[in-house]
Amino acid sequence: MLIDAHCHLDHLSGDEANTFLEHLSEKGLQALIACGTKSEDWEFYQNLSHKFPALKVCYGIHPLEITDNWQKDLDALEKFIPQSVAVGEIGLDFHGIFQQEHIPQMKLQMKVFERQLRLAKKFDRPVVIHCRDAFPILKEILIYSQFPLQRVMFHCFVEDREAAQWIEARGGYVSYSGVLTFKKPGNTVETATQFPLDRIFVETDSPYLAPVPFRGKQNSPEFVHYVAQKLAEIKNISLEACIQITSNNTRKFFGF
C-alpha cells in the first residue's frame, strides 16, 4: 500500500479527521506524513498521532505562517519536535514579493528558516522543505548552515533540471505531487525522468493540488495513487514496483 509523503489535515474537523484515519487502509494507504505548519495546529496533529500510529507528524513554521510571535512559536516548536518524524514544512516562499518593500519579510523568512534548521540538527530530525521562487537563496542557507542534504526532502518539487542535479549530487530527496499529472507539468516530468527513483517520494499536498482527473477539486491523501501511477509511467516500471520503492524511501527517510 501507498504512503502519502506530504499532506495536511487541519482543514478537517476533529471528527472528520478521526473518521478518515480510521478507514486509511480501505483507501489503499499504509501511512500519511502530515505537516502542521503553524503553532495553532500542532496540538491538533499531536492528538491525532497519539490515536492513529499510521499518522506520522511533522511540526514547523511555514514561511507564509510567520507572525509577529515567531520567537514564541519557535520556543513552542522545540517542545513538539521530539514527538515528530521531521521538522516541516519549513523554507522560503518569495512568490510575488520581489519588491523593495518586501525585503524585511524576505529576511525574516530566511532567519526563521535558519533557526528551524538549527532545531532540526539539535533534535536529529530531517527537514521537509517548502521552496517557491527562492531556490538560489534557500540553497545558500543550506550550504551556510551545513545541513546535510541526505536529510532534506524538497516537497512538491517543481524546480528546474539544474536544481535537481544539485540536490541529487548531494544525496537529497524530492517529492512529486499532483503537478506531475497536469497537462502543463512544468519541469516535473523532466526532473522525475532523471532523478534516481530511490530518492523520490510521492505526495498529495492535500487539500491542495489535486491530480488529474480531480484537478480543481479538493485533494485527498488517497489520490496519491494517481501520482504514483504517473511516476511509474515516467520511470517505465510497474505501479506495484513504484509503490514499493517510494514507500520504502519514505519509511527510510522518516525513520519508521
Would you name each region that the model predicts?
Residues 1-256:
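Mid-domain alpha/beta scaffold segments of enzyme catalytic cores
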